[in-house]
Amino acid sequence: MPKDPQPASTISLASLPAIGAALDGGIFAGLTTKPDSTHCAVVLLPGGGTDLTWKKAKTWAEEQGGELPSRPVAALLFANVKASLQLGWHWTSEEFDASYAWYCRFYYGDQFNVLKSYEGSAVAVRQIPLTA
């Protein structure tokens, strides 16, 4: 069951708090643009999953009311809210191929791929579309 069953559906750019401030049950980490050109506020949700395969990490993130971060969003988290992250490697939402997926090490911010069957950590993010 999601921790925040009523997340914000949209948010205006003018109403965004400072990076690192509370927003929608988490911490505002910055802005991103999805592949469909939707601009979104990124919220790092509280807590973290550990000892999770990639598939289990995706399920865990959904249970938190969010999703695993994409590779660009993981880089955004590292750049803007590193102090709120556990060091070590964390799954991203992106597959490399059928057997491998990408992860981000929040100690250095670098990204590599690893077998999806390996157990790692995870963070969950929520992306809130921006309105004018």
Report each predicted region and the residues it spans.
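Extracellular adhesion/carbohydrate-recognition regions
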Residues: 1-66, 115-116, 121-125
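C-terminal, surface-exposed recognition/capping segments
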Residues: 71-132
